Amino acid sequence: KFLPHIDNNYDFAELLSEWLGELNVSHTGGRYYASGQSEPTASLGLLFDWNYRDKGMRIAEVIEKGPFDNASTKAKAGIIIEKIDGTEITPEMDYYTLLNDKAKKKTLVSLYNPQTKERWEEVVIPISGSALNTLLYTRWVKQRAADVDRWSGGRLGYVHIESIGDDSFRSVYSDILGKYNN
């Protein structure tokens, strides 16, 4: 009945999604992603203060295990990124375009400490969007565990099941029999 009306991948993905919904099964899906010549945008592994309105981007947080999370960097919350590969970041620009196609490539970042008035440059290797998502996911899980610990006064443990698979099972099992076994 629907087949004559399906003439592109997007419509087929929609129909497949409807069928899977009728089956009421989990962990399934159909998606369509348009092909294109897009440039993947890399990440510096930083969270920014979106209330900051001056030149540059003010760092709000350095994400654990990201490009700036190392002993040799001076980047931390409050530091301003003024330039990426020599291009100044202005308040009206979309700075993300400066990171297009930069994942796994050395990138020069110019920084400024407004407290000490010091300026310096560091070379980092930005990560891909999917690598950033993994770091943010890990950050989220750790924050939930810290919340549960704080709210319960240390009486409860937080166990997160990432997926239905061996690695996730072993991680949960290790938490239950390890750090939460008292």
Spans of model-derived segments:
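Extended, small/polar residue-biased N-terminal targeting/export presequences
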Residues: F2-D54, E118-Y137, V141-K142
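Glycine-centered secondary-structure boundary/capping sites
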Residues: S17-N24, G45, K74, G153-L156, ...
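PDZ/PDZ-like domain segments forming the peptide/carboxylate-binding groove
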Residues: E39-E92, D166
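Extracellular/periplasmic catalytic domains that process cell-envelope and extracellular macromolecules
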Residues: Q37-P40, W50-R53, K74-K76, K102-A103, ...
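Solvent-exposed, acidic/flexible segments
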Residues: H5-L16, K74-A75, E88, E92, ...
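Cleft-lining beta-strand/loop regions that shape enzyme active-site pockets
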Residues: A60-E61, P67, E82, G86-N182
